[in-house]
UniProtKB/Swiss-Prot annotation:
Superkingdom, taxonomy of origin: Archaea
Keyword set, alphabetical order: Ribonucleoprotein, Ribosomal protein, RNA-binding, rRNA-binding
Subunit structure: Part of the 50S ribosomal subunit.
Naturally occurring in which organism (per UniProt): Thermoplasma volcanium (strain ATCC 51530 / DSM 4299 / JCM 9571 / NBRC 15438 / GSS1)
Name used for this protein in its record: Large ribosomal subunit protein uL6
Keyword Ribonucleoprotein annotated: yes
UniProt KW Ribonucleoprotein keyword: yes
Classification lineage: Archaea, Methanobacteriati, Thermoplasmatota, Thermoplasmata, Thermoplasmatales
Annotated function: This protein binds to the 23S rRNA, and is important in its secondary structure. It is located near the subunit interface in the base of the L7/L12 stalk, and near the tRNA binding site of the peptidyltransferase center.
Family membership: Belongs to the universal ribosomal protein uL6 family.
A Pfam family recorded for this sequence: Ribosomal_L6
GO biological process: cytoplasmic translation
GO cellular component: cytosolic large ribosomal subunit
Gene Ontology MF terms: rRNA binding; structural constituent of ribosome
Length: 178
């Protein structure tokens, strides 16, 4: 018989609805919904009232690491539903003015270093991207999706074969505004 011991307890606000179906944890607040799979053989989730308990059957460094990671991810899900995450990026160029626009689920970067073909970056999940002057604002309930979208935009403006200390054109993350 496996003995499960309680490793961590996360308090959930009363207005956030929590559901656990197998290993899939879903949270709903208003019209926002987040789902994440938490699967492991030695660490499990239990939902009781307005608490999520993380229990483990082994006590070694791997399981302690998983417990801490899961606790952080669950608290980020709650924070994302209640407040959201906002990142700010700056459009930086020296000679050729970049035109940045949002078309559907992609960010289109035109006239980067005078290139004729536009560069594109994918918008991940429910992330909202808006362009105001030389700033890009990324908002969304999932920290992972907002961060991945910011990385996609920054990666789309990498210049291969040039010294980045000299050629500093690009779109860079300046604030995580958490």
């Amino acid at each position: 018989m496996i003995k499960w011991e309680e490793a961590s307890v996360i308090e959930i606000p009363k207005d956030v609805k929590v559901g656990l179906s197998g290993t899939m944890l879903s949270m709903t607040f208003g019209n926002k919904k987040l789902e994440k799979k938490f699967a492991d053989n030695y660490v499990r989730l239990l939902v009781e009232d307005n608490k999520i308990k993380i229990v483990k059957s082994k006590n070694n460094s791997r399981e302690r690491g998983i417990v801490g990671t899961w606790a952080s991810e669950i608290s980020n899900m709650v924070k994302g539903l209640k407040e959201g995450f906002q990142y700010e990026m700056k459009i930086d160029y020296s000679h050729f003015p970049m035109r940045v626009s949002v078309k559907g689920k992609t960010v289109v970067i035109e006239n980067f270093f005078g290139e004729r073909s536009p560069r594109t970056a994918e918008i991940v999940g429910e992330t909202q991207v808006s362009v105001k002057g030389d700033r890009l604002f990324l908002n969304g309930p999932s920290k992972k999706d907002v961060g991945e979208t910011a990385a996609n935009i920054e990666r789309a403006t990498i210049i291969k074969g040039f010294d980045p200390r000299v050629f500093q054109d690009g779109i860079y993350l300046i604030s995580k505004g958490e």
